[in-house]
């Protein structure tokens, strides 16, 4: 087992794009940890609409007010990334009961791959509980207003890329 630091958390995701729900979760988790690493996954199997570098830049801009948060893109197995940064906690968000089955399965798999790391689930603030990146992308793709769901820079990037 690797040496891990339970004061360091990794919040992984595709963040395609980062939303106000993601930002809320990081903002509420930031005081709980010495450091949070937002790991932006390449995720080619998901066919992201925004390139990795742009997703990283948008997340950095959205989270820049938190001194203990860093944003790093990665294209490896999550378990390898977590070990690389020395984190002892995987941070995940649960919006609804429908998220639980998938997240439970992922947490169980990660427990086998990185048993020294704990998974911690946080729920979003109620006003963000329905927001998902895929819904934000779809609304933007169809010409809808997503300014209430994502930062202005994300809204502009979606308009340019979709």
Curated annotation (Swiss-Prot):
EC nos: 2.7.7.3
Function (record text): Reversibly transfers an adenylyl group from ATP to 4'-phosphopantetheine, yielding dephospho-CoA (dPCoA) and pyrophosphate.
Q: Does the keyword ATP-binding apply?
A: yes
Record-linked SUPFAM superfamilies: Nucleotidylyl transferase (SSF52374)
Q: Where in the cell is it found?
A: Cytoplasm
Question: Which amino acid positions bind substrate, per UniProt?
Answer: 14, 46, 78, 92
Query: Which family is it part of?
Result: Belongs to the bacterial CoaD family.
Domain of life the protein comes from: Bacteria
Amino acids binding ATP = 14-15, 22, 93-95, 103, 128-134
Q: Which UniProt keywords apply?
A: ATP-binding, Coenzyme A biosynthesis, Cytoplasm, Magnesium, Nucleotide-binding, Nucleotidyltransferase, Transferase
Q: Does the keyword ATP-binding apply?
A: yes
Disulfide bonding pattern of the chain: none
Major localisation:
cytoplasm
Q: How does it assemble?
A: Homohexamer.
Q: Which reaction does it catalyse?
A: (R)-4'-phosphopantetheine + ATP + H(+) = 3'-dephospho-CoA + diphosphate
Q: In which pathway does it act?
A: Cofactor biosynthesis; coenzyme A biosynthesis; CoA from (R)-pantothenate: step 4/5
- Spell out the InterPro entries in the cross-references: Cyt_trans-like, PPAT, Rossmann-like_a/b/a_fold
> In its UniProt entry, what is this protein called?
Phosphopantetheine adenylyltransferase
Query: Its gene?
Result: coaD
Q: Name one GO biological process term.
A: coenzyme A biosynthetic process
**Which GO cellular component terms are attached?**
cytoplasm
Known cofactor(s): Mg(2+)
